From Swiss-Prot:
The encoding gene: MT-CYB
Record-stated family: Belongs to the cytochrome b family.
Protein name: Cytochrome b
Purpose: Component of the ubiquinol-cytochrome c reductase complex (complex III or cytochrome b-c1 complex) that is part of the mitochondrial respiratory chain. The b-c1 complex mediates electron transfer from ubiquinol to cytochrome c. Contributes to the generation of a proton gradient across the mitochondrial membrane that is then used for ATP synthesis.
Cell compartment(s), UniProt: Mitochondrion inner membrane
Positions bound to heme b b566: 97, 196
Gene Ontology terms describing biological process: mitochondrial electron transport, ubiquinol to cytochrome c
Residue numbers binding heme b b562: 83, 182
SUPFAM superfamilies: a domain/subunit of cytochrome bc1 complex (Ubiquinol-cytochrome c reductase) (SSF81648), Transmembrane di-heme cytochromes (SSF81342)
Length: 379
């Protein structure tokens, strides 16, 4: 008798994706982040759904509705902090996942990589709009500053900003539409994830060596199902530690003050996961230039596959590229730190140097290192 999982069309899809999927035998813990991102997305959709049951997207009541969730709703505080810190875990996993892709040359799967970049943009947009919803000081001013960047677009800028706002400033219309978009986008993200996986399963997974592993495959279940479950446990443990011990560690105290258009906070800054891009934006004195640098800081990922000069796919056997990769990681951490600092003397210069270094490593130094490594191989 044919196994039940191999005949019904739906179970067949599940079987080919999660059970009988041939996977490389040597993929490390860096390959866990894909499934962890799936878990994060599910946590966010579920907690978000329950928050939306009690939230009101109106400037007069938004802030107090969040307070009501935390004080009066059964386990409302838990749902709210799971959602807020779940976003942080989401971005930690995202950056690790992208970093893995760069280190091991996974970007050579062009379709998967490009869908991944679209996913990254979609998640960033969702997180930004979600941050506006509690309608605290940082929500309001963050929305004002970031949407205002679009006014740098020549000719149509101002019109575009007012169109997004639904008026002449960030107000009720803006909050309502941001809530609508924040609700719908995660489901679009879920659909994109399916396409991401569809393209990945066309080629199969990469592995740390970067060498085709067709001759050495193992079934996904039980080997990688149990490995993913271990990853889930670690992620949930870290998330619960954050939520139950210091839920406001990564948040901004200013967001506990209701939004006031007449009072600007001393330091307007986004959530920690956007600080590196914010630092790049601020390091350029020109508005349009800053916006272009901001967009390019993420869009540069799309150029990486075309800058791959090495004869090897992975960085596993490329020491010069490895050093550059870890300098890039340190540079991103530096930018994250600078993004949270005031615009004052040493920080401005550090930010500018770090921004130049960021683009230089990706566009110039890494391709050069690859060419040098190719020469060393010949020699």
């Amino acid at each position: 008798m044919t196994n039940i999982r191999k005949t019904p069309p739906l179970l067949k899809i599940v079987n080919h994706s999660l059970i009988d999927l041939p996977a490389p035998s040597n993929i490390s813990a860096w390959w866990n982040f894909g499934s962890l991102l799936g878990l994060c997305l599910m946590i966010q959709i579920l907690t978000g759904l329950f928050l939306a049951m009690h939230y009101t997207s109106d400037t007069a009541t938004a802030f107090s509705s969040v307070t009501h969730i935390c004080r009066d709703v059964n386990y409302g505080w838990l749902i709210r902090y799971l959602h807020a810190n779940g976003a942080s875990m989401f971005f930690i996993c995202l950056y690790m996942h992208v970093g893995r892709g760069i280190y091991y040359g996974s970007y050579t799967y062009l379709e998967t990589w490009n869908i991944g970049i679209i996913l990254l943009f979609a998640v960033m947009a969702t997180a930004f709009m979600g941050y506006v919803l509690p309608w605290g000081q940082m929500s309001f001013w963050g929305a004002t500053v970031i949407t205002n960047l679009l006014s740098a677009i020549p000719y149509i800028g101002t019109t575009l900003v007012e169109w997004i706002w639904g008026g002449f400033s960030v107000d009720k219309a803006t909050l309502t539409r941001f809530f609508a978009f924040h609700f719908i986008l995660p489901f679009i993200i879920a659909a994109l994830v399916m396409i991401h996986l569809l393209f990945l399963h066309e080629t199969g997974s990469n592995n740390p060596s970067g060498i085709p592993s067709d001759s050495d495959k193992i079934p996904f279940h039980p080997y990688y199902t149990i490995k993913d479950l271990l990853g889930f446990l670690v992620l949930i443990l870290l998330l619960m530690l954050l939520v139950l011990f210091s839920p406001d560690l990564l948040g901004d105290p200013d967001n506990y003050t209701p939004a006031n258009p007449l009072n600007t906070p001393p330091h307007i800054k986004p959530e920690w996961y956007f600080l590196f891009a914010y630092a790049i934006l601020r390091s350029i004195p020109n508005k349009l230039g800053g916006v272009l640098a901001l967009v390019m800081s993420i869009l540069i990922l799309a150029i990486i596959p075309f800058l791959h000069m090495s004869k090897q796919r992975s960085m596993m056997f490329r020491p010069i590229s490895q050093v550059l990769f870890w300098i890039l990681v340190a540079d991103l951490l530096t930018l994250t730190w600078i993004g949270g600092q005031p615009v004052e003397h040493p920080f401005i210069t550090i930010g500018q140097v770090a921004s130049i270094l960021y683009f230089s490593i990706i566009l110039i130094l890494m391709p050069l290192a690859s060419l040098i490594e190719n020469k060393i191989l010949k020699w």
